[in-house]
Regions:
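Short beta->alpha connector loops at strand-helix junctions that form conserved
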Residues: 40, 64, 84-85, 104-106, ...
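Hydrophobic "lid"/C-terminal helical patch
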Residues: 176
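A cross-family phosphate/adenosyl-ligand binding-site feature
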Residues: 1-97, 136-170, 181-193
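Arginine/glycine-rich "motif VI" loop of SF2 helicases in the C-terminal RecA-like domain
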Residues: 54, 121-128, 154-155
Length: 193
């Protein structure tokens, strides 16, 4: 794997573990020689994960919105920035430039990105591992909702199980790497279609 997108909050949250885990993710990816693709921001968990990657010798590729770029909210340390006009264009760039995805604690934007990734994998528009870092149970309620959606037959068991979930940064990254998919992987079989 060459590039992994990390989606996370533009804020640090009120639990110091979120920032600690964001830093660990950047450090672990760097130790494995994997570049970080992220939202380009110079704030919150985005700044922490990108700085950790840059401090440890890999590239951080920022994919930001023109509106935020104009407000000078972009990490000034970035050598590689892609600026998009819309959120849809931004998510498309993430999907094109990444071999896998990690979602850390975050808000509505992180939830939107997670849902888009799961839907794109389900439809076969992408075929890439998606990991969810469940720091101190942050995503427990979301996972419970997903399980309920599986029970009610709105999400397939296979699509739910395709999401890689861990509360450990190291374990999550290792599971994502183990689940790297060849270009010719038949996603329909993996999802039970």
């Amino acid at each position: 794997m060459k590039n992994i997108s990390v989606f996370c909050g533009a804020h640090e949250g009120n639990n110091p573990r979120y920032a600690e885990d964001a830093k660990k993710i950047g450090e672990i990816l760097a130790a494995k020689g994997i570049n970080v693709v992220f939202g380009g921001g110079n704030v919150g968990l985005m700044k922490i994960v990108s700085d950790a990657a840059l401090d440890n010798g890999v590239d951080a590729i920022g994919i930001g919105l023109e509106s935020l770029h104009n407000l000078e909210l972009v990490n000034p340390r970035l050598k590689n920035q892609i600026i998009t006009k819309t959120l849809l264009d931004r998510k498309d760039e993430f999907m094109k430039r990444s071999d896998a995805f990690i979602v850390l604690p975050g808000g509505v934007g992180s939830l939107d990105e997670l849902a888009e990734l799961m839907a794109n994998n389900q439809l076969g528009l992408i075929n890439k591992p998606v990991g969810l870092l469940n720091t101190e149970g942050y995503y427990d309620h979301l996972l419970a909702w997903m399980r309920k959606a599986v029970e009610e037959d709105f999400i397939t068991e296979a699509n739910f199980n395709d999401l890689i979930v861990s509360s450990s940064c190291e374990d999550l990254i290792n599971l994502i790497i183990e689940n790297e998919r060849p270009d010719n992987d038949d996603w329909t079989k993996r999802l039970g279609l």
